[in-house]
């Protein structure tokens, strides 16, 4: 049993929620053992959460939660919008290593509709560094085509690793 955690942070990202709620995505996730889902839908107005097959998927869905770190800590796969805060929560694996055996796979989906498409830049840089996998909405299903061993993990317990990455990004 694998836990899939989807988060859109405080934004409205209906397209991401609709994509993960689609029958095709559900089937792929189930085939790969993700039968427990937590979906944080933020200010989304879509009603597609009801399309998730609860006879096959254990589901917890909410707009906001004061204890969201708990879900980052236990997820096996994190699908996040491209917000820097959410990405950092997903990749800061060492903070959670006391609670878990491994760092989760983190997949980011930039929300291109936001001002100046600002999420794409940080997502692309982190993807280039092998920290996260980055997908567009229409290619999100491809995350199930990769073996777990293909995901590179970056240990961010050393603050200098993150500082160097951030400095490179900003320069």
Where are these regions (language model features)?
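Nucleotide-activated sugar donor-binding and catalytic core shared by glycosyltransferases
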Residues: 1-171
